[in-house]
């Protein structure tokens, strides 16, 4: 018999996370590493676990994540987005709760491009009157 698993893809900035929810005890593996070893900061671990804590499904699923691109904050946001989408596939009744919390919305904020004549996206060279 085939294993029951729920897939979800999350994105944030340049990061893409492919998330699999498998019935289990609440383990979170990111790129085959424990979440404690992957994310050094506690705040990033909290961000990743938010959808599971909100819906009360922390102990029902093992979370297997493959994430690439971007930095740590972008990756944490992408994982949260992917977990939320996978939870909706597992139980449609969770959708209003997750939508209200904003976990199903793809954060559209991206890095602004550098403009010519400037040092960065908005940072101008120092102005000298004389």
UniProtKB/Swiss-Prot annotation:
<dbReference type="GO" id="GO:0022627">
    <property type="term" value="C:cytosolic small ribosomal subunit"/>
</dbReference>
<dbReference type="InterPro" id="IPR000754">
    <property type="entry name" value="Ribosomal_uS9"/>
</dbReference>
<dbReference type="GO" id="GO:0003735">
    <property type="term" value="F:structural constituent of ribosome"/>
</dbReference>
<dbReference type="InterPro" id="IPR023035">
    <property type="entry name" value="Ribosomal_uS9_bac/plastid"/>
</dbReference>
<keyword id="KW-0689">Ribosomal protein</keyword>
<dbReference type="GO" id="GO:0006412">
    <property type="term" value="P:translation"/>
</dbReference>
<dbReference type="InterPro" id="IPR020568">
    <property type="entry name" value="Ribosomal_Su5_D2-typ_SF"/>
</dbReference>
<dbReference type="InterPro" id="IPR014721">
    <property type="entry name" value="Ribsml_uS5_D2-typ_fold_subgr"/>
</dbReference>
<comment type="similarity">
    <text>Belongs to the universal ribosomal protein uS9 family.</text>
</comment>
<keyword id="KW-0687">Ribonucleoprotein</keyword>
<dbReference type="Pfam" id="PF00380">
    <property type="entry name" value="Ribosomal_S9"/>
</dbReference>
<dbReference type="GO" id="GO:0003723">
    <property type="term" value="F:RNA binding"/>
</dbReference>
<protein>
    <recommendedName>
        <fullName>Small ribosomal subunit protein uS9</fullName>
    </recommendedName>
</protein>
<dbReference type="InterPro" id="IPR020574">
    <property type="entry name" value="Ribosomal_uS9_CS"/>
</dbReference>
């Amino acid at each position: 018999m085939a294993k029951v698993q729920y897939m979800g893809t999350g994105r944030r900035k340049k990061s893409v996370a492919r998330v699999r929810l498998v019935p289990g005890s609440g383990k979170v593996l990111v790129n085959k590493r424990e979440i404690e070893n992957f994310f050094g900061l506690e705040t990033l671990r909290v961000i990743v676990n938010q959808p599971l804590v909100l819906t009360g499904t922390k102990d029902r699923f093992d979370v297997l994540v493959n994430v690439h691109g971007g930095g740590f904050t972008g990756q944490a946001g992408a994982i949260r987005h992917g977990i939320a989408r996978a939870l909706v596939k597992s139980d449609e009744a969770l959708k209003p709760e997750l939508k209200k919390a904003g976990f199903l919305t793809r954060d559209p904020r991206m890095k602004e491009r550098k403009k010519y004549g400037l040092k960065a996206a908005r940072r101008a060279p120092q102005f000298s009157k004389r």
